[in-house]
Amino acid sequence: MALTPEQISYRQQLVAMGDFNAHTLLPGEEWTRPENADVRHVLSLIPLTDIQLANRLDVDERTIRKWKSGETSMVFTTWCCLCWLAGLGMLLEEPA
């Protein structure tokens, strides 16, 4: 499924703010691992508590805290899920 116009606009606004790495929104091999600030920003866009998000992703709540602090890095598939939950579209799909 292609990105909606709303998702495209949302991504553009996020990147235009200047404190978000657009390369974290690229699919597959082109993807750049998000920095701590990118992770915190995307997590702040998700309308779930840390406990709810941990349950949704089947991870421990401590893992969410470690992502926020930068103590633990994130794999691509988890980042895809977070971006999807934040309304940024699904990164697993190749652009049209």
Regions found by a protein language model. Name each.
Residues 73-94:
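DNA major-groove recognition helix of helix-turn-helix/homeodomain DNA-binding modules
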Residues 1-33:
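N-terminal flexible/basic segments that precede or flank functional cores
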Residues 34-37, 59:
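Alpha-helix N-cap/N′ positions at the starts of helices
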Residues 32, 42-43, 71:
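Charged, low-complexity surface patches
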Residues 1-3, 92-96:
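Short intrinsically disordered terminal tails
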